[in-house]
Amino acid sequence: MDLKNYVASIENYPKEGIIFRDITPLMNDGEAYKYATEKIVEFAKDHHIDIVVGPEARGFIFGCPVSYALGVGFVPVRKPGKLPREVIEYAYDLEYGSNKLCLHKDSIKPGQKVLVVDDLLATGGTVEATIKLVEELGGVVAGLAFLIELVDLKGRERLDKYPMITLMQY
């Protein structure tokens, strides 16, 4: 299945010069959504994952069904003020701005093998921040999974020490 047939490209969104890859058509098609999830699950099974972590918000969309299929838990990584218990946080840069991510302090146990799932690999800043949070809690990042990779932004180079799958490249 060619998943690119289920991604809409929106020029100059969210700002001038950016091409936004809209995955909602993929999410709207049950077979495409299932196929994408199954490809990530196949990758994860080779890496003996204990828990799945996904950054807000689209990391939830693919991370949750992957964790369900693997029979492991899911840990949300959120923006400040969105998690109710004690958190750790990390600041990072986006393709078009900056932000902070937070993780509950008790969400990852030392030594747990973690799969980080997100919709998009651009500069790698969001996932790098997520990795820092996971490793600060003693988790071991066993793999990274992305629906889309924006090759020209070279995020893979920042993350090349981790096993990785991307389902589409632009």
Swiss-Prot record:
One of its GO terms (biological process) is AMP salvage. PROSITE patterns: PUR_PYR_PR_TRANSFER (PS00103). Coiled coil: none annotated. One of its GO terms (molecular function) is adenine phosphoribosyltransferase activity. CDD domains: PRTases_typeI. Pathway: Purine metabolism; AMP biosynthesis via salvage pathway; AMP from adenine: step 1/1. Its main location: cytoplasm. The keyword Transferase applies. It is found in: Cytoplasm. The keyword Metal-binding does not apply. InterPro entries: Ade_phspho_trans, PRibTrfase_dom, PRTase-like, UPRTase/APRTase. It comes from the Bacteria. Transmembrane segments: none annotated. Catalyzes a salvage reaction resulting in the formation of AMP, that is energically less costly than de novo synthesis. NCBIfam families: apt, PRK02304.1-2, PRK02304.1-3, PRK02304.1-5. PANTHER family: ADENINE PHOSPHORIBOSYLTRANSFERASE (PTHR32315:SF3). This is Adenine phosphoribosyltransferase. It comes from Fusobacterium nucleatum subsp. nucleatum (strain ATCC 25586 / DSM 15643 / BCRC 10681 / CIP 101130 / JCM 8532 / KCTC 2640 / LMG 13131 / VPI 4355).
